[in-house]
Amino acid sequence: MEKRIRALKAIILVVVMIVELFGVDAVRVVAETINVTGDTTISTEDNRDYAVTDCTLTVSSTGNITGTVFGSGGTIVNQGSIGKIDGNIKVDNQAGASIQDLQSSVDITNAGYITSATYSSTYTLTNSGTIDTLNVNNPGFSDSAATVNMNAGTISSLNVKNHTGTNPVINYAGGTITSLTAEGTNGADLVVSGSHEISQLKGTVNVSGSGMLTVSGVLQLEKGYTGENLGVTKDTVLTVKDGNTIKVNYNDHTYSISSATEQKITELAGNTVKAVMDDAATMTAETPFTLETYMYGEQATAVYMANDDYYFPEDYTATVTVGRGTLDITRINAKKINLAYTFKDENTGVEISLPAATAKTTQDAPTGLTGGIEKVTGVTTAMEYAGSKTSDTWT
């Protein structure tokens, strides 16, 4: 007995020394692993590991497995909380449930919350819940690959690695994918239905489908793209490798971009406009064209005033000397005109030539008046007169 007590004291002394030197984390208690071969339900907090084989493990809404569930066939139905799942096992993560770390290579259905998931499979992951980070790795099969059905909910970061084999397919039908990055020679196939927005799209991504995907942040594809499913905003930063061409839609117009290095669509295909007066002594820009960049389909306006002793005739016209857009001139009155240019251009400095305003003329005083009758003969109804030199209206 005395020897046992001395041995126990020695063990305690060693533990105390380890804790003092390395802290309590250095002392690890290995929990028991529970083998599950028949359908089982967990309804309490449990820090043990579970090994599930060809059966169903259900974690109820009050259940919380803080350890790891290893799978070899069978199904996990989670209504509560699980720390980690690893292995070949189907996972049904229901609404209100959570999984911290999911490492599975069989079918996954998520309507709850998953912090991190790594999916190396030829099966299907269907999401209508929330996944912070989803990593999809192609195991290298040439005839099958993983499928991600994005029906609703959110995936903040979706990362695909595929160097060989069939491309993983991402069916984007609903919800929000914030970022998609595809690494590897083959990359991923993104099939879009409906209209969606994504902040970042990078790597080898083949976009197709019947919908429109608008990239609002960063668009950086490794290959060219000539489809009709990609859109951008004025704030999208594009990078296109030399030798590649991508087509993007902005404001219902398609642009072909052949080279770009972290540039916005306004820098790559934007337009400017200016008006050049033939004789600046005859008019003044009350509201000139702004110096901003305009895109195809947008309109720029300006207002010009005739100077004193000048006016704009009713048939006043201006000419677009550089540009393919349309120019509309509205004569507000004899002193003021409005210019409206609608761009049908890309990467063009539009120029508009403004002819000089017309000088006003003064009628000679009438001659040959007799008998004190002060009138002018020969006046017709087509003639107009102004009440003063500065009058804006004619009668």
Predicted regions and their residues:
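Bacterial N-terminal signal peptides
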Residues: I11-G23
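Extracellular interaction modules
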Residues: I12, N251-T254, S259-E267, I332-P355
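Sec-dependent signal peptide cleavage junction
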Residues: L21-T33
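Bacterial N-terminal signal peptides that target proteins for export
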Residues: M1-I12
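Extracellular ectodomain segments of secreted/surface proteins
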Residues: L268-Y296, I352-K375
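Extended beta-solenoid/beta-helix repeat architectures
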Residues: A31-A269, T367
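Short proline/glycine-enriched turn/loop motifs at strand-loop junctions of beta-rich domains
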Residues: N307-P313, V376-E384
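Surface-exposed interfaces of beta-sheet-rich extracellular modules
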Residues: G227-N229, H253, T301-I332
